[in-house]
């Protein structure tokens, strides 16, 4: 069982991730949480480069190859071994983020990015992808508030510092990409309350997998 969470900044993925892991474990399924970038040792180093607000001169192409390196190592060291042991893997972002952020957001070719992703992951695609959909203005406000509260604006806030126009392209890109990949995408209304959001998540997972 391989589930990925996608969405714009501040869409509430992290809270729902933890609740899904607990729910799966309560129903007898081993589960582990991971993230991109940063799910492996190398990924942690790359995350510090990619998200640091001081690195605002990175090109879309530079971002692309750093994310692909992170993803390849993540799949090899974390995701495949866990799946081989029968553990459910729940990842906060995966390959679709690159298609959307560097493709629809930065203007690179989404189809090319999908092919490069397939090389990086060696054909390992999620069984289910949950897209947390939210108006960019709301998401940015949430994310900025979180970074201020946690003191992570400088080290984790590079994408939050992008323009509203960029985040609007990202949101629209996610919806376009989800429509092109309907077989594994489910859209979550991330503007709902945390409990309502999790109920949508639980229902989507139960529709795809046999739980309990």
Curated annotation (Swiss-Prot):
Record-linked CDD domains: TMPK
EC number: 2.7.4.9
Residues holding ATP: 7-14
The family this protein is said to belong to: Belongs to the thymidylate kinase family.
HAMAP family in the record: Thymidylate_kinase
Ranges in a coiled coil: none
Catalytic activity: dTMP + ATP = dTDP + ADP
One GO molecular-function entry: ATP binding
Role summary: Phosphorylation of dTMP to form dTDP in both de novo and salvage pathways of dTTP synthesis.
Record-linked InterPro entries: P-loop_NTPase, Thymidylate_kin-like_dom, Thymidylate_kin_CS, Thymidylate_kinase
Biological process terms in GO annotation: dTDP biosynthetic process; dTTP biosynthetic process; dUDP biosynthetic process
Record's protein name: Thymidylate kinase
